[in-house]
Amino acid sequence: MSQSKKPSESTEVMPISGLLETLGFSNPSLRCAVRKIIETAGYTNPRKTNIAVDKAKFVQIYIKTNFRLVCSEECDAASGKKRTKSSLRVRADKCEFCNGSDQNRLVAKMAKNLSDRGLSEILIIGGSTQSANTLNRLLKSCKINLKIIEGTKRTNLKMAKLLCRNADLVVIWGATQLDHTVSKVFNIAAEPGTKVPVARPGLKALANAVNIHLRSD
C-alpha cells in the first residue's frame, strides 16, 4: 500500500516591498524602518527581497496586532484606546481610524483640537440619530463627553441654561432635525463664547465648524 504524500508547503512568493506597500507603507524611509521591525521579529533577513505568501499573512497579523496604523497625528490621538501600542504612519486608506474618510479625519482633528484646549464637555443640539451614533463611535476612545439633545424635543429655558452651563461648547446644528423653538431657547441659553452654529447637515460640516471656532478662539 502506497503511503499518502504529505502536502507540500506553498512555494509562492511576493516582494517584501510589495507586502509593505499593501499594508500602507508607501513612504520609502518608513518602509525601510518597518522592514527592520519584521527582520527583528524573525520573519525575514536583510539578504532577502521576497517572502513566502504564507509567511506574509503572519507578518500582516504581527504588524496589525503590535502597532497602531494611523495616517496622521490627529488620527493617532483619536484612536486612544490602543495607547499601549506604538504607532506607525500609513497611507490614509489603511488608517485604522479614518480609513481614508475625509469626514473621519475632520472628526479626528476636532477631537485633537478639543483635547489640546482642555475641552471635554460638548453639548450638541439637533442632528440625526445616525449622526449621533457615528460620532459616539468615532470618539469612544477619546476623553470627550458628548451630550446630544434631540432637535424635536422641547426644552425649557431653565433646563437649557443648566445644560449649557455644564458644557465647554454648545453646538447648534442647523439644517438637521432641529425645531426653531428648540434652537431659539439654546441660542438664548448658551454663552456667546461657547456657541458654535452649524449651518449644514453632515458630520463634516459639524467638525469643520468646531475646528474653525477653536481656531478663531
Language model: regions and residue ranges:
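Redox- and metal-dependent alpha/beta enzyme cores, enriched for Fe-S-associated oxidoreductases
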Residues: 110-144, 148, 152-163
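Short metal-coordination and nucleic-acid-contact micro-motifs, chiefly zinc-binding Cys/His arrays
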Residues: 64-67, 91-94, 118
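Long terminal accessory regions outside catalytic cores
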Residues: 1-65, 71, 75
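Ser/Thr/Gly-rich flexible loops in soluble cytosolic domains mediating phosphotransfer, phosphorylation
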Residues: 189-217
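Short metal-binding segments enriched for Cys and/or His
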Residues: 100-112
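Cys/His-coordinated zinc-binding microdomains
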Residues: 72-79, 99
